[in-house]
Each structure stands twice: as C-alpha cells, then as structure tokens.
Amino acid sequence: MINPAEVTNYNRTQSELQEFILFCINVAGKKSSIEAPKLEVFLERAKDVTAKHRKSELMKDASPFDCIRALIKLGRLNEIMHWAKLSPYAQRYNSYVAVSKIKDLQSVTLNRLLQVPGIGLKTARFFLSHSREDFDEPMLDTHILHFLRDQGYTDAPKSTPSNENTYYYFANIFKNIARQLGKTVTDLDLEIWKQYSKTQ
C-alpha cells in the first residue's frame, strides 16, 4: 500500500509505478489517507477476481495494469471499482482504462500523462516529482498556493489554476523560491505539505 506520508521513491518497479499512478489519480481532490486503503482493497480484489477467472495463482502476482486489463476483458472493472468505493466511478473508470495503456511509466513524459482523462498538470507533476529524481517541477496544490500567498504573492489563487499560463507563472515563482532556499522543488513541497496540512 502507498503510504501517503512517504510517497517519494525513485527506485520503484513498473508494478510499483503502476500502483503509484493509480494512487495519484485517486487522491486528486480527495484525502490521501482515505483513498490509499481503498486502492489497496481494489488491487487485492482485482487480483483475486482475475486469478479465479483464469484459474491461475499466477494472477496473484500480476501488475495493477495487468489486473485492470483483465477486468476490462471480463467486463468487471466498473463492478470492482464500485466494490472498493473508488468514486467518482465514471471518471475513475475512464482514467484507469486510459492509464493502463501506458507501456512504460519509468520513461513516460509529462505530455503523455496529460492525455489520460483525469490527469491534469498537478497530478502528472506529482507523479513525476515523486518517482523521478531528475524531475524538479512543482505541483501547485492548495498548500503551495497558501505558502505563496504567505510569501507575499497575494494574487496566488486558492485552488490549482486550470489556465496553463497562470499555472506556469506561479510554478516558476515557487521554483525560484526553492532555489533561493537551496532546496529542490520536491523537498520544499514536502516541507510545505507537512507544515500546512497540519494547519488546515
């Protein structure tokens, strides 16, 4: 299971990356401590269902994407998502179907991730920041935006901007602050998350 307090891992296997991208999709706009166990329940159930259907214990070791593709073929993905309470169901279903088509998450690009329904700039950057050491771009969440307002950028929005120009404008400000502090974007982001998530 993904530990929401320790998401940074630059040495994940393909299977672990698959679980992590599903986690990233699920927690968008939701509480990670609630969504992480739901994903675990979904993956366990998905493995059980596909293993029983194929009458093979080998499916118990299948990757998350293998299980999703098998559930799609069985016509049971939506059922298992409801069983695990992975809502909003239609949105998650579309995201899971699309993301399971990505062959290699170790080399996936930001633009390829953005083609998946339900993955925006924040989710894509979150995934890449916490799975690739060389990716040092901010994900503008409510905590970072609150931090920016506290730093005097009072025009920083309260929620993640959907306009790309606005997003990049505030992302660059945050990158500059991190550099001035001698920190990586990911490290400063984690510090801010720990500090601001306690106060909200």
What function would you assign to each model-found segment?
Residues 1-19, 89-100, 106-108, 115-200:
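C-terminal accessory module of base-excision DNA glycosylases/AP lyases that mediates lesion recognition
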Residues 4-7, 19-27, 75-82:
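Glycine-/proline-rich flexible loop or hinge segments
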Residues 14-46, 168:
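Extended cationic-aromatic binding surfaces that line active-site or macromolecule-binding grooves
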Residues 23, 27-30, 39, 67, ...:
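Generic hydrophobic/packing signal
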Residues 29-37, 49-53, 103, 134, ...:
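Amphipathic alpha-helical interaction segments
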Residues 44-117:
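Alpha-helical ds-nucleic-acid-binding substructure associated with the helix-hairpin-helix region
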